[in-house]
Amino acid sequence: MQKLINSVQNYAWGSKTALTELYGMENPSSQPMAELWMGAHPKSSSRVQNAAGDIVSLRDVIESDKSTLLGEAVAKRFGELPFLFKVLCAAQPLSIQVHPNKHNSEIGFAKENAAGIPMDAAERNYKDPNHKPELVFALTPFLAMNAFREFSEIVSLLQPVAGAHPAIAHFLQQPDAERLSELFASLLNMQGEEKSRALAILKSALDSQQGEPWQTIRLISEFYPEDSGLFSPLLLNVVKLNPGEAMFLFAETPHAYLQGVALEVMANSDNVLRAGLTPKYIDIPELVANVKFEAKPANQLLTQPVKQGAELDFPIPVDDFAFSLHDLSDKETTISQQSAAILFCVEGDATLWKGSQQLQLKPGESAFIAANESPVTVKGHGRLARVYNKL
């Protein structure tokens, strides 16, 4: 068991106050503190103190003895810690994104390598051959968009802006997946006068429309007034997660985080196809090829946890990670898994034991538990989040 020393990513959309208010993390230079990373991602691995008292990279520690630390099955299947665990603090909307599935990621990665596109090139889509499933768990009220609305709902929301673009009128005449695909691509392709006119019609509709999703469009327009992604809340479900609610983000499904603080767990991948609310490169043909144009009702988007005593287990449809919450009390309980785990203290305090070793976690602190250290004993007050594997 080792306490993690984690890095903060200072992306421009991050909150300058959330990590300080929630977890007392100092921010003397008033930087945006967008994401706290827990894991062994090559871009920014957590660090731990070794037996000699030196601070070393968790990635290097794992690399030196994968089977023991990750567990035999995970080491064989993934060859590394297969997940990245984050605290995400959004003060501004993030870009609308789509993550390709595993098969397309492998093909796209090989194709871009063969074409000699540098890894850091703006037009590079595939940074690795992996998929990027994600789970988001709200710590504060959390606003997001996820998946296409039911087509009948899109039709009624598009009525006030029917004249903004011919592709909108086409979809209204025949609301099916093919027309939605054309509409999605057409809105992203808009340039110059065509784009100005469409956005003017949308903004004029804002004057007469109340409630959602118009309120979300107003919020986004404060940050991206000239982005065609402003139409996206009319097409995608706007989801408000209450603290303690979670949502899984499937491959090939457009989504965006807009505002709030959440825990996020994902597979170790940087594969992102952008779809608006960004000044960055958008590869529209590649994006459209990787989107499933199917509706998903908003009431099916939340992940329903399964309660097992003091544990809440959130079912995850992939092997890359598992996620559960543990409510602590003075009564000792054990936490066990056949893999490595990262434990994060969400609130309160936790004491962990393994043999003669004892570790205390305060809110915002986290620990790495190697596979060969399972089970560990825990007690305290408040709540622990656990990310691990069920292989």
Swiss-Prot record:
Keyword annotations: Acetylation, Cytoplasm, Isomerase, Metal-binding, Zinc
One BP annotation, GO: mannose catabolic process
CDD domains the UniProt entry points to: cupin_PMI_type_I_N
Cellular component terms per the entry's GO annotation: cytosol
GO molecular function, one term: mannose-6-phosphate isomerase activity
Catalytic residues, chain numbering: 274
Entry-linked SUPFAM superfamilies: RmlC-like cupins
UniProt keyword Cytoplasm, yes or no: yes
Chief place where the protein resides: cytoplasm
Cofactor(s), names only, from the UniProt record: Zn(2+)
Cited PANTHER family: MANNOSE-6-PHOSPHATE ISOMERASE (PTHR10309:SF0)
Role of this protein: Involved in the conversion of glucose to GDP-L-fucose, which can be converted to L-fucose, a capsular polysaccharide.
Stated name of the protein: Mannose-6-phosphate isomerase
Organism: Escherichia coli (strain K12)
Gene coding for it: manA
